[in-house]
Amino acid sequence: MIVCKTPEEVLDQVRLWKAQGKRIGFVPTMGYLHEGHASLFEECISKADKTVVSIFVNPAQFNDPEDYAKYPVNTEGDLKLCESKKVDLVFLPNKETIYPDGIPDIVLKIPNLMKSLCAVSRPGHFEGVLLVIFRLFHFVQPDFAFFGKKDYQQYLLIREFCNTLAFPIEVIGCETVRSSQGLALSSRNSRLSETEKEESLLIYRSLKLGENQIFSGIKNPLLVKEIMKDVLDSSSKIRLDYLEILNADTLDPLEVLEGEILLAIAAFIGPVRLIDNLTLSVPTS
């Protein structure tokens, strides 16, 4: 496995592979890797000839400096996991490498997909995501890029970003990996106590209850949201950020629960903010 710390090293290796006719797959991460990331690596390896993983905690996407400071780091463990999964190249830059002149004063937006969810509750977050992805795509020049659907809005934004700018990159969304009890795997879970992990299972239970209500025939989104919210309100440890039911393609509000549907929750368990979602396909009447 090759480990690169500069864009020049990455570009040199990628150009060599492309000269050999190899297709490049890319999985950008912020490190503290877990089995959810490993599933992205496996998807990438199955589709691409060469797999590149980046590990970079991007300061531009944190609207809370304390959240950035507390983001977990385990570089040694991350490299071991990448090697065990047969990743070909790990790009391990630092902040000065990605932003040599500091974080630039440029704003990247896709307004139609940034009217709700994390775009509203974390101002500036997705602008920072799009900025770093733009740079990483420039350095890695991938044919395919893989993103987990746990961060569903991010996946939609990056897919639309590539389409709008005519990047020759296929953006592939991969299903959320969960614990045996249903908790979506996340690097932030490491900051939860065992009691908080138990409480956080209510997020998935709320989503599954919403799914069951919709498939039972309920068409009113407000009614389903109230039923889902009751589950979360049963715990004093959960502080709801948002609970939304939206069109899964456009992120627009729904008046009737039909077609492609996104159920999305963000909530704080203690100081830790977790997100999760389900997507449903409901036949129209």
Curated annotation (Swiss-Prot):
Domain of life of the organism encoding this protein: Bacteria
Official protein name in the record: Pantothenate synthetase
Cited function: Catalyzes the condensation of pantoate with beta-alanine in an ATP-dependent reaction via a pantoyl-adenylate intermediate.
Protein family per UniProt: Belongs to the pantothenate synthetase family.
Note in the entry: The reaction proceeds by a bi uni uni bi ping pong mechanism.
EC number of the protein: 6.3.2.1
Keyword Cytoplasm applies: yes
Subunit structure: Homodimer.
Organism the protein comes from: Leptospira interrogans serogroup Icterohaemorrhagiae serovar Lai (strain 56601)
Predominant place of localization: cytoplasm
GO molecular function per UniProt: ATP binding; pantoate-beta-alanine ligase activity
Keyword set, alphabetical order: ATP-binding, Cytoplasm, Ligase, Nucleotide-binding, Pantothenate biosynthesis
Protein residues bound to beta-alanine: Q61
Associated pathway: Cofactor biosynthesis; (R)-pantothenate biosynthesis; (R)-pantothenate from (R)-pantoate and beta-alanine: step 1/1
A GO cellular component entry from the record: cytosol
Residues that bind ATP: 30-37, 148-151, 177, 185-188
Pfam families: Pantoate_ligase (PF02569)
Localization: Cytoplasm
Catalytic activity: (R)-pantoate + beta-alanine + ATP = (R)-pantothenate + AMP + diphosphate + H(+)
Binding residue positions for (R)-pantoate: Q61, Q154
Disulfide bonds: none
